[in-house]
Amino acid sequence: MATNRRVERVASLIKREVSQMLMSGIKDDRVGAGMVSVTDVVVSGDLQHTKIFVSIYGTPEAKAETMEGLKSAASYVRSELGQRVRLRRTPEVIFVEDKGLERGTQVISLLEQLTREREAREAAQAAAGVVDSTEDA
Protein backbone atom coordinates (compact mmCIF):
# COMPACT_ATOMS: atom_id res chain seq x y z
CA MET A 1 0.00 0.00 0.00
CA ALA A 2 1.40 3.38 -1.00
CA THR A 3 1.69 6.27 1.41
CA ASN A 4 -0.78 9.15 1.25
CA ARG A 5 1.94 11.43 -0.04
CA ARG A 6 2.76 9.07 -2.90
CA VAL A 7 -0.92 8.59 -3.76
CA GLU A 8 -1.38 12.39 -3.90
CA ARG A 9 1.72 12.80 -6.05
CA VAL A 10 0.57 10.08 -8.47
CA ALA A 11 -2.90 11.68 -8.62
CA SER A 12 -1.33 15.04 -9.43
CA LEU A 13 0.80 13.52 -12.21
CA ILE A 14 -2.20 11.71 -13.68
CA LYS A 15 -4.27 14.90 -13.59
CA ARG A 16 -1.58 16.83 -15.45
CA GLU A 17 -1.04 14.13 -18.08
CA VAL A 18 -4.75 13.50 -18.71
CA SER A 19 -5.35 17.26 -19.02
CA GLN A 20 -2.66 17.39 -21.70
CA MET A 21 -4.17 14.38 -23.47
CA LEU A 22 -7.60 16.02 -23.50
CA MET A 23 -6.16 19.11 -25.16
CA SER A 24 -4.20 17.36 -27.87
CA GLY A 25 -3.98 13.58 -27.62
CA ILE A 26 -7.49 12.15 -27.85
CA LYS A 27 -8.65 12.15 -31.46
CA ASP A 28 -12.24 11.01 -30.79
CA ASP A 29 -14.64 13.68 -32.11
CA ARG A 30 -17.10 12.92 -29.31
CA VAL A 31 -14.61 14.18 -26.72
CA GLY A 32 -14.53 17.54 -28.49
CA ALA A 33 -18.35 17.86 -28.41
CA GLY A 34 -18.20 19.69 -25.06
CA MET A 35 -15.47 21.65 -23.35
CA VAL A 36 -13.79 19.17 -21.00
CA SER A 37 -11.52 19.84 -18.04
CA VAL A 38 -10.15 17.54 -15.37
CA THR A 39 -11.36 18.74 -11.97
CA ASP A 40 -9.99 16.00 -9.72
CA VAL A 41 -8.25 12.65 -9.74
CA VAL A 42 -8.67 10.05 -7.01
CA VAL A 43 -6.20 7.17 -6.91
CA SER A 44 -6.78 4.10 -4.75
CA GLY A 45 -4.32 3.38 -1.96
CA ASP A 46 -2.81 0.44 -3.86
CA LEU A 47 -2.40 2.58 -7.02
CA GLN A 48 -4.45 0.07 -9.05
CA HIS A 49 -7.51 2.22 -9.83
CA THR A 50 -8.05 5.86 -10.61
CA LYS A 51 -11.21 7.91 -10.97
CA ILE A 52 -10.80 10.95 -13.17
CA PHE A 53 -13.46 13.57 -12.50
CA VAL A 54 -14.20 15.76 -15.51
CA SER A 55 -16.30 18.87 -15.88
CA ILE A 56 -18.05 19.18 -19.23
CA TYR A 57 -19.53 22.42 -20.51
CA GLY A 58 -22.24 22.15 -23.10
CA THR A 59 -25.74 20.88 -23.76
CA PRO A 60 -26.92 17.69 -22.04
CA GLU A 61 -26.60 15.87 -25.37
CA ALA A 62 -23.01 17.09 -25.81
CA LYS A 63 -22.21 16.05 -22.23
CA ALA A 64 -23.56 12.54 -22.81
CA GLU A 65 -21.69 12.26 -26.10
CA THR A 66 -18.46 13.48 -24.49
CA MET A 67 -18.78 10.99 -21.61
CA GLU A 68 -19.28 8.16 -24.13
CA GLY A 69 -16.16 9.29 -25.97
CA LEU A 70 -14.15 9.45 -22.75
CA LYS A 71 -15.30 6.00 -21.68
CA SER A 72 -14.30 4.54 -25.03
CA ALA A 73 -10.93 6.33 -24.80
CA ALA A 74 -10.18 4.98 -21.30
CA SER A 75 -7.94 2.18 -22.59
CA TYR A 76 -6.00 4.66 -24.75
CA VAL A 77 -5.61 7.01 -21.77
CA ARG A 78 -4.38 4.12 -19.63
CA SER A 79 -1.78 3.06 -22.21
CA GLU A 80 -0.58 6.67 -22.59
CA LEU A 81 -0.34 7.01 -18.80
CA GLY A 82 1.75 3.84 -18.77
CA GLN A 83 4.23 5.48 -21.12
CA ARG A 84 4.22 8.92 -19.45
CA VAL A 85 4.07 8.08 -15.72
CA ARG A 86 6.63 5.70 -14.27
CA LEU A 87 4.65 3.20 -12.23
CA ARG A 88 5.11 -0.52 -11.74
CA ARG A 89 1.52 -1.09 -12.81
CA THR A 90 -0.66 1.45 -14.62
CA PRO A 91 -3.97 1.98 -12.81
CA GLU A 92 -7.36 1.23 -14.35
CA VAL A 93 -8.96 4.46 -15.58
CA ILE A 94 -12.58 5.40 -14.88
CA PHE A 95 -14.02 8.72 -16.06
CA VAL A 96 -16.70 10.30 -13.86
CA GLU A 97 -18.66 13.45 -14.70
CA ASP A 98 -18.16 16.05 -11.98
CA LYS A 99 -21.42 17.92 -11.52
CA GLY A 100 -20.15 20.02 -8.62
CA LEU A 101 -19.62 23.17 -10.69
CA GLU A 102 -23.06 22.80 -12.25
CA ARG A 103 -24.67 22.36 -8.84
CA GLY A 104 -22.73 25.30 -7.46
CA THR A 105 -24.01 27.49 -10.28
CA GLN A 106 -27.57 26.36 -9.55
CA VAL A 107 -27.18 27.19 -5.84
CA ILE A 108 -25.81 30.66 -6.62
CA SER A 109 -28.69 31.26 -9.05
CA LEU A 110 -31.24 30.24 -6.41
CA LEU A 111 -29.62 32.48 -3.80
CA GLU A 112 -29.70 35.43 -6.21
CA GLN A 113 -33.36 34.73 -6.97
CA LEU A 114 -34.20 34.63 -3.24
CA THR A 115 -32.36 37.91 -2.69
CA ARG A 116 -34.29 39.59 -5.51
CA GLU A 117 -37.59 38.28 -4.15
CA ARG A 118 -36.77 39.48 -0.63
CA GLU A 119 -35.76 42.92 -1.89
CA ALA A 120 -38.99 43.20 -3.91
CA ARG A 121 -41.05 42.12 -0.90
CA GLU A 122 -39.26 44.64 1.36
CA ALA A 123 -39.77 47.41 -1.21
CA ALA A 124 -43.48 46.58 -1.44
CA GLN A 125 -43.78 46.58 2.36
CA ALA A 126 -41.92 49.89 2.62
CA ALA A 127 -44.24 51.41 0.03
CA ALA A 128 -47.23 50.17 2.02
CA GLY A 129 -45.73 51.53 5.25
CA VAL A 130 -45.27 48.13 6.93
CA VAL A 131 -42.11 47.75 9.04
CA ASP A 132 -40.46 44.35 9.41
CA SER A 133 -40.48 43.36 13.08
CA THR A 134 -37.20 41.42 12.75
CA GLU A 135 -35.26 44.61 12.04
CA ASP A 136 -36.35 46.22 15.34
CA ALA A 137 -34.83 43.46 17.47
UniProtKB/Swiss-Prot annotation:
One of its GO terms (biological process) is maturation of SSU-rRNA. It holds the Pfam family RBFA. The keyword Cytoplasm applies. GO terms for cellular component: cytosol. SUPFAM superfamilies: Ribosome-binding factor A, RbfA. Keywords: Cytoplasm, Ribosome biogenesis. Its main location: cytoplasm. GO terms for molecular function: ribosomal small subunit binding. Coiled coil: none annotated. It is found in: Cytoplasm. One of several proteins that assist in the late maturation steps of the functional core of the 30S ribosomal subunit. Associates with free 30S ribosomal subunits (but not with 30S subunits that are part of 70S ribosomes or polysomes). Required for efficient processing of 16S rRNA. May interact with the 5'-terminal helix region of 16S rRNA. Monomer. Binds 30S ribosomal subunits, but not 50S ribosomal subunits or 70S ribosomes. NCBIfam families: rbfA. Belongs to the RbfA family. This is Ribosome-binding factor A. It comes from Synechococcus elongatus (strain ATCC 33912 / PCC 7942 / FACHB-805).
